[in-house]
Amino acid sequence: MNEKTDFNSSVVVVQPIDKGMVDMLNAQDDLYHVNLQGLDKGETVNSLTMIDVISRALNPYTQNNEFMKLAEQPEMRFVISNTTEAGIAFDPSCKLADAPASSYPGKLTQLLYHRFKTFNGDKSKGLIIFPCELIFLNGHKLKETIYQYIELWQLGDEFKTWFEEACGVYATLVDRIVPGFPRKDIAAIKEKLQYDDNLVVQAEIFHLWVIEAPQEIAKEFPADKAGLNVLFVPSEAPYHERKVTLLNGPHTVLSPVAYLSGVNIVRDACQHPVIGQYINKVMFNELMETLNLPKDELKKFAEDVLERFNNPFVDHAVTSIMLNSFPKYETRDLPGLKTYLQRKGELPKGLVLGLAAI
C-alpha cells in the first residue's frame, strides 16, 4: 500500500510471547524477504520481495515500557494480530499491573487503557483492530474478551464507552498457505540475494483477506487500490462458508477418490484425465450451486482454488487430507449435498461418489 497508494505508514512488530524472533528481526535491520511460489493465471511464479516497512520489533516481556509508549503515539491507528487460534482467550489470572499481561487480549486492553488515559478520552485517538486468528468471527471473540478484562480490572464506564465508540474491532477471514522458512530452498535464495536472510518467509501466490467492516474503514485502509485481494463486506459468514465449501469440501472428496485410483498427490489428481474432470464437476456443477454469493465471485474463487491445488511447488499428499474424513465430510460436504438435493430435487452424484470412496 505504501508503494501504490498514499498510505505512507510503518509497522512496529510486537511478539505476543516471551520467546520469539524479534532479536533476529532487529539484527537484520528489520528487513526480510517474502518468497511467493505458485501459479498466477496459469504462469509459474517464484518471486522474492523485500519487506521494508517495519520500523522496529519489540519484546513486551523485556521492553514493556517501549511497548506501552506505542499507545502514546497520536498517529497510531491500526492493530493487526495473528496469535494463533489459542491466542484470543481470557486468562483471569492476568492483572492490570502485570508488565505485560500474559494473554494477547490482556496486553491489548492494557495498551488501549494507556492510550485512553494519555489522550484524556479523545475519541479521535481510537484504534482500528483487525484480528487474523483462524477463529470464526474472531473480532467478536476478541471484543468480548476485552470487555471481560474491563470488568475484571474495573476500568470504569468512561473507558468502556471510549472503547465502544472510538475503537473498532472487526472480524476477518484470512486465506493463504504460508509454509514459512524455506529450508530446502534457502541456499539458492541466499545465492540469489548475495547475502544471508535468515527470516525468509515462503508463501503461495493466492491471498484473500475478508474484513467485516464498513466502507469508511476501507477508505482509511486502501488495500483495494494497491491491487490486493482484500474485501470489506457487511458479513464475513458467506465467505467463511465459501472457503469451507469450495476449498475444504473438494479436498475432502477428491482425496479418497484419488487414493483409490492410485494417485497420491493433489496436483497429480487435478491433472488426471478422469479425476480432474470429476473434481471440476463437483466444484462448478454441484458445490457452487449451493452458495448464495455472486456467481462471478464464486467462479473466480473456484478457479483460484484449482490453481492452488495445481501448485508445482507443493506436494500435498492425499493421505494427509484423508485423516478424519467422515467428520470432515459432515461439516464440509454434507451441508452442500443437502442444499443441492433441496434445490435440484436430486442427489449430487459427485459428492455421493466422494462419500462412497471414504
PLM regions: where:
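Substrate/ligand-engaging "lid" and interaction regions
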Residues: 2-358
